[in-house]
């Protein structure tokens, strides 16, 4: 399901000191049986879209799928294919029997980025983030990160790594960096 977000081209451009490069692109994937069934509102996906746009990302897609390995892996593979940017998932990272987003993500990623997942877990207030099983990794030139299903948890997790995401995405795109 798409909510009509089109890529923005008028903000979020990043300067390398000599030239302007395109704004960073992002997609959001919500894993929720309740949202798919219409019994729950998609607050987490909406919160992530807003946080990404505030950070200067052009949000190209916002999709909702049911929990489960096959549905999430299929959507992630589709969203990452040929995409240069960030794919953020929300939901399915806990201990419930259908919380299988990390397992689905492992089917799609080629290289894991454990430092990002560790930073997101450590940033949660009161340490509840330690219960998240979310992972992060790359698929082609897309960086995929899993965040918890609550709006606050999703945004806090994203914000914990926002400062390094532009650099990571430039590295994935094989663009020059200053390191």
What is each model feature region?
Residues 1-179:
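Non-catalytic beta/alpha edge segments that cap or flank active sites
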